[in-house]
Amino acid sequence: MTARRLIISPNWIGDAVMAQPLVQLLHKEDPHSPIDVLAPTWVAPVWRAMREIDTVIETPLKHGKLQLGHRWKFARQLRQRGYRAAYVLPNTLKFALIPWLAGITHRIGYKGESRYGLINRMHHDDRAAPRPMVSFYAALAHAPAHHFAHPDQLPKPRLHLDEERRKKALDETGVQFGKPLIAFAPGAEFGSAKRWPTTHFAQLAHIVRDAYPEADIVLLGSAKDHDVCEEIAAQVGPKVKNMAGVTTLEQALAVLASSDAVVSNDSGLLHIASALNRPVIGLYGPTDPDHAPPFSDVAKTISLRLSCSPCKKRICPLKHQNCMRQMEAQMVWDSLRGMLAS
């Protein structure tokens, strides 16, 4: 029996997508050795959309909590599955405990919180010049080295939904087949600084509706984004459907996979849409578009690159959020129009 390999998932949806090239590299290296993932429940649907993954083991572990009893429970479960290697993607000591407790021989990851002993094939990152996320994770497929592959040298992150699953999930949402579909993702888990203003999303929706009156516009996000999306829907009217907090992540995957174009802040949904290879426009303000750009074949990154950005702050420290506010709806439409026309 071929020994299995295990990936310990990050807590963030976008980070899980950025780790997909690592999965492709591991599968190419040994296609007969199954790859499993230990993932939080809210991230698990992303891993299930990766063809190279064999089994996704869901955990109730909460972000920032030690929950030592739960970690020991999962370690015992993993010990029985016979893993030869574990790739620990989060940088915290807590996640490195699990494969160590499970007795997995090779434990690969970054130094993180001084995880000496818990990680025994240790990689190091330059915090002064952090790598692009896909390069950061993909480096774990090889022996530790000072150099790393540029994103252009790596496989692109890719997710796949089979047609039956996609149609079933779409039926559950009430989204109609055969009509032009544009998805907006106005939320941002990281913080309010990353959000394009609701007024701007509403202006863009009006422009889209005037140009394509037959199109459906859907607003996607988590329950935390519902009120933000409701503000947009209230400004636009019934042609916009607020699905934030209503859909499961798997249903959101199906909607994104069926969209003719996606406009999103720098969020997990942007990276899902990109990995599904949909035409996407990513709106970047306080974050660096070169650190985690979209990788779909048709993609546009919009960033004003003001002198104060990327500040990487959750809330604008200058109180004006000009990096997002000065990004006008017409500017976004100029890119979106070409995507919809083609």
Q: Which role does the model predict for each range below?
A:
Residues 1-342:
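Catalytic machinery of carbohydrate-active enzymes
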